Amino acid sequence: MSTTLLQSDLPGLPLRHRGKVRDVFDLPRDRLPADAPPGDYLLMVATDRLSAFDVVLPDPIPGKGEMLCQVSNFWFHKTEHLMPNHLMDIRVEQVLPEGVDPALYAKRAVVTRKLKPVPVEAIARGYVIGSGWKDYQRTGKISGIELPDGLRQAEKLPEPIFTPSTKAAVGDHDENIDFDAMVKTVGAELAERVRDATLRIYRFAADFAAERGILLADTKFEFGTDADGRLYIMDEMLTPDSSRYWPADQYEPGTSPPSYDKQFVRDYLETLDWGKTAPGPRLPADVIDRTRAKYAEALQRLADISVD
């Protein structure tokens, strides 16, 4: 069984950001191998924290960070021919401070290049579900994109669509925006590059997942640029936290299909008298165990990686 990590503390490494799930540290040059290419680097740690309704919950999911990191790394390498990514070929053990147990971080941390984040979430949707379903019911559109009349919940769209959203701070909510609003935020040229890369990767990943009996309903990417303006995909990639995966044999349009994610947690929280603001409630052991099992099943089916 993996060691549970709720929060990473690495003496001597400046904490750059603590998000809902990931802790990000700056890597001083003296922590890097002598042969590391020029540039600035980060250490990104996937903890076992779990968020729901934009609130970080007090109970972790044991091993979740390791599973998320392994899924991301699988997809980063699988899609290298489509898009460069932020990963650097430097082992985590080489940069950890003295006295820190490498076994705790080896499977949940990566060394990455430091990039300038594109300040928009890049979302690809192949099915009408979630916030997209709510928008469609209200307006017949998602992010300003006109869709056919009469679509049912979870129905497959004629073509995948790009639906950007704002990138909210921890505790705030992302808001769907249309492409014109994204252009005003980042410029037309960068917006088009992000849109094209998002849809290209989504189509590839959806085809790959379908071969393994999984439907990729939608996913969220984050992109960043280097000093030369080169675009990279960064943060996490096609994990159960950032994507909606459905077992193909249980898919039925007009319903809300079961998914390989934290739906057990959301369903449980919906039964509580809780205002969906911090602090979040404690989770029962069976909800934690069932959620962990879903993450493990996704890792096994997609990447053929088993966990204890």
UniProtKB/Swiss-Prot annotation:
UniProt GO cellular component terms: cytoplasm
CDD domains: SAICAR_synt_Sc (cd01414)
GO terms assigned for molecular function: ATP binding; phosphoribosylaminoimidazolesuccinocarboxamide synthase activity
First-level EC class: ligase
Catalyzed reactions: 5-amino-1-(5-phospho-D-ribosyl)imidazole-4-carboxylate + L-aspartate + ATP = (2S)-2-[5-amino-1-(5-phospho-beta-D-ribosyl)imidazole-4-carboxamido]succinate + ADP + phosphate + 2 H(+)
GO biological process per UniProt: 'de novo' IMP biosynthetic process
InterPro entries referenced in this protein's UniProt entry, alphabetically: SAICAR_synt/ADE2_N, SAICAR_synth, SAICAR_synthetase_CS
EC numbers for this chain: 6.3.2.6
Any coiled-coil regions, as ranges: none
Keywords of this entry: ATP-binding, Ligase, Nucleotide-binding, Purine biosynthesis
UniProt keyword ATP-binding, yes or no: yes
Pathway this chain belongs to: Purine metabolism; IMP biosynthesis via de novo pathway; 5-amino-1-(5-phospho-D-ribosyl)imidazole-4-carboxamide from 5-amino-1-(5-phospho-D-ribosyl)imidazole-4-carboxylate: step 1/2
Presence of the UniProt keyword Nucleotide-binding in the record: yes
Protein origin, superkingdom: Bacteria
Pfam family name, one: SAICAR_synt
Family: Belongs to the SAICAR synthetase family.
NCBIfam families: PRK13961.1 (NF010568), purC (TIGR00081)
Protein name as annotated: Phosphoribosylaminoimidazole-succinocarboxamide synthase
Organism annotation: Xanthomonas euvesicatoria pv. vesicatoria (strain 85-10)
Lineage summary: Bacteria, Pseudomonadati, Pseudomonadota, Gammaproteobacteria, Lysobacterales
